[in-house]
C-alpha cells in the first residue's frame, strides 16, 4: 500500500501573515490619521480661539467708542434743550415787559402834557379868585395864561395852524367858502378857526376861506 502525503498549508500561512501585516499597517495608518485629525482639530480650535479673541478685542473698542459718542450726543442734546428753554423764557419775559410798557404808555400817555397844563389851570383859578374888577390886571393875567398855554403846547409838540396866505391844503385845512380876492386862486384868504397838529398828525384842521378863481 502506498502512502500518499498530505498537502502542506504554507500558502494559507503566508496569506494569514500577509493579512496580519496589512491589518497592522491599516491600524498604524488609522492611528496616524487619528493623531493628525486630533492635531487638526486642536489647531482649528486654537485658530477659532484666536479669531474670537481678535473679534472681542475689536468689538470692545467699538463699543466703548459708541458709548462715548452716545454720552457726547446726550450732553449736546441736554445743552441744546437748556439753551432753548432759556431762549423761550427770555422771549416770554421780553414779551411781558413789552406788554407792560405798552399798557403804561396807554395809561400815562397824556401824563406829561397834563403836567404842562397845570400852570395854566393855576393862572385861570387865580384870575377867577381876583375880585378887584381891574380890567387891565385881568387882561394881563389872560395874556400870561396864554403864554403858559403856548409853552405847554410847545413842550407837548402841539403846533398851531394859522395858514393865511398859504396854498389850500385839504389835509390840513377845511374850506368853509370860496371868496373873491386879489390872491391867487386856492389861496387861504382868512382863518376863521385855527387848527392844531400833534407832531405830524392833524388834531384839528384850520377853518378857512379860499380865494375863488378869477
Curated annotation (Swiss-Prot):
PROSITE patterns documented for this protein: GRPE
Q: What PANTHER family does its record include?
A: GRPE PROTEIN (PTHR21237), GRPE PROTEIN HOMOLOG, MITOCHONDRIAL (PTHR21237:SF23)
* Pfam families the record matches: GrpE (PF01025)
Name its species.
Ralstonia nicotianae (strain ATCC BAA-1114 / GMI1000)
Q: List all Polar residues biased stretches.
A: 1-13
Task: Share what the entry says about its subunit structure, partners included.
Answer: Homodimer.
Q: Which protein is depicted?
A: Protein GrpE
InterPro entries with a match to the protein in the record: GrpE, GrpE_coiled_coil, GrpE_head
Q: Which gene encodes it?
A: grpE
